[in-house]
């Protein structure tokens, strides 16, 4: 898929992603991991699922809830839910996505 195929996201140069087309723009920063809150868990960084808007913690966090969510639901792409970060990651294609200009 060409890097310009996604209206909201472009695939980083040299990468291929079959999931970028039609993804919504990231909806901004989040405050907490929805999965850590009920168990009193700690998180390092937050990721937002672009399929269902679920907010979960990154792989540097003890519980790695974003990856667990992607695996359990087959939702392929998460975006950073951190302030001043504008990128997304496609799990199946291991591709970095950046906002389209």
Residue ranges and their predicted role:
Residues 2, 52-54:
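Structured catalytic/translocation cores of nucleotide/phosphate-coupled proteins
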Residues 1-7:
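Extended, low-complexity, charged intrinsically disordered regions
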Residues 41-51:
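Canonical RING-type zinc finger of E3 ubiquitin-protein ligases
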Residues 8-9, 13-21, 27-34, 39, ...:
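Cys/His-rich, Zn2+-coordinating zinc-finger modules
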């Amino acid at each position: 898929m060409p890097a310009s195929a996604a209206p909201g996201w472009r695939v980083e140069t040299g990468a291929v992603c079959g999931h970028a087309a039609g993804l919504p723009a990231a909806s901004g920063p989040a405050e907490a991991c929805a999965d850590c809150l009920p168990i009193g868990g700690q998180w390092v960084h937050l990721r937002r699922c672009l399929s269902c808007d679920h907010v979960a913690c990154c792989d540097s966090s003890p519980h790695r809830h974003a990856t667990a969510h992607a695996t359990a639901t087959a939702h392929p792409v998460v975006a950073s839910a951190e302030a001043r970060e504008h990128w997304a990651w496609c799990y199946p294609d291991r591709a970095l996505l950046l906002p389209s200009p």
